[in-house]
């Protein structure tokens, strides 16, 4: 796509456990590593990976924790991919010829506002993309939000909450579900196994990668 990028060797972990447990000093330290690396490298944009809490930590909580605005943009990887696609710098080829649906991660969609970009990408890659009844900002949680995914004692709670998602999947009759949050993916993979559901889970970024056109992009 013609973009220059780098990966800081001392600020590569984006998930912020300090925010998850309410420890503001730790949260500030972890965000500070990323901000410090970004400023040292003089980057124009910091890209959050497929992790809802990482996106929240650096984009929305970060400036408050640091007490100042950033001199760089923060975007979710799906925002970047869709920006490149619209600019003609990222070309996709082929399609996934099977019915599938998309799970909107709470932190990315409901809180972050990133819900149009995944659909733009999916509509190009998956002609049989099907929306859940409640989607976008109204989509149901995977069952692992609010730190529940990290609590072993909350396993039954996760499986119970997932029943609503289970009903959504069964209503559509799909065998493949795509998402853009690693935490959601792990939680739902465990719940799918628990409920004996033969559903394939995919990350949208990996789906895009598998359909990249290696031809020369537009200048």
Region annotations inferred by a language model:
Residues 1-219:
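Iron-sulfur cluster-binding electron-transfer modules in prokaryotic oxidoreductases
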């Amino acid at each position: 796509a013609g973009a220059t990028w780098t990966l800081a060797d001392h600020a590569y972990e984006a998930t912020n456990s300090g925010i998850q447990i309410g420890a503001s000093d730790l949260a500030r330290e972890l965000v500070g590593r990323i901000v410090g690396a970004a400023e040292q490298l003089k980057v124009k944009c910091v890209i959050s990976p497929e992790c809802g809490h990482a996106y929240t930590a650096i984009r929305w909580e970060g400036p408050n924790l640091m007490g100042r605005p950033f001199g760089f943009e923060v975007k979710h990887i799906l925002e970047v991919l869709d920006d490149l696609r619209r600019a003609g710098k990222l070309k996709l080829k082929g399609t996934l010829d099977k019915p599938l649906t998309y799970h909107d991660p709470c932190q990315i969609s409901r809180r972050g506002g990133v819900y149009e970009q995944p659909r733009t990408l999916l509509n190009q890659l998956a002609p049989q993309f099907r929306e859940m009844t409640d989607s976008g900002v109204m989509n149901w949680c995977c069952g692992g939000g609010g730190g529940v995914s990290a609590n072993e004692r909350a396993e039954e709670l996760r499986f119970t909450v997932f029943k609503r998602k289970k009903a959504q999947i069964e209503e559509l009759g799909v065998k493949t579900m795509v998402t853009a949050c690693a935490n959601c993916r792990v939680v739902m993979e465990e719940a799918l196994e628990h409920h004996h559901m033969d559903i394939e889970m995919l990350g949208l970024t990996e789906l895009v990668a598998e359909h990249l056109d290696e031809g020369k992009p537009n200048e």
